[in-house]
Amino acid sequence: MVSLREQWNEQARERQREISARKTEIEEARSSIQKELQAQYEARLAATQQLQSELRQFYNNLANDTAGFLERTRTTREQMAQKLEQELTQLITDLENNTAALLQEANQERVRVSQQQKALAIELKNQLAQFHEQLETSVGNWRQETQEQQQQTAAQLREDLNAFSANLMAQVEKLLINLEETRTANAQQQREALFNFRRQLTVDVWGETESDSLKVEENTPSDVWGETESDFLEVEENTPFVT
């Protein structure tokens, strides 16, 4: 029984270590994915900020160049303004498209990571359910084996106790018969001692109460040995005194 419990405890600790290791792997994977997403987001943000900075610089340079150019060439101001407006519109359109593409890619990456985390959580839940099922099965088997072992031990102990009691009772009966045949002067004292021993033995072996033992003692001369109290006294009076 101790070995089964130790084996069960070792299996439980092994499962616990496996679950802990699996949780650690999941946390490391989740942390790695989050770090990767954070790095990508920071890189995209830095690129966007750099692009915006370059755009502002370009816009400032363009504005300065345009102002100088317009100052130098007043005759072609409208044409240059239209051209610059087209370039700015195209640049803004490209920037918006790039930003939308980056945002869409980031959303797709976030969805993919969320699906991976959900799959890992489902797998961990299934493993925990399987572990609990195996644990309940192991506990049930251990209880059944322990109960069967206890029943076998109790049956064997009962058989040994019955055999010992029968043997001891036979020896007591034989000794009482021998004492009855010899009719010695001290037979009465020996018989009383044997009666008391038999009563104590009955209490110890069969678990009788003190009142039951007294009933057995009161009924012993006539019921067990077939003698009445007067026969008992007559035998004692007719028995020579032997030291």
UniProtKB/Swiss-Prot annotation:
Keywords: Gas vesicle. It comes from the Bacteria. GO terms for cellular component: gas vesicle. Disulfide bonds: none annotated. It is found in: Gas vesicle shell. Its main location: other. The keyword rRNA-binding does not apply. May confer stability to the gas vesicle shells. Gas vesicles are small, hollow, gas filled protein structures that are found in several microbial planktonic microorganisms. They allow the positioning of the organism at the favorable depth for growth. Belongs to the gas vesicle GvpC family. This is 35 kDa gas vesicle protein. The lineage of its organism: Bacteria, Bacillati, Cyanobacteriota, Cyanophyceae, Synechococcales.
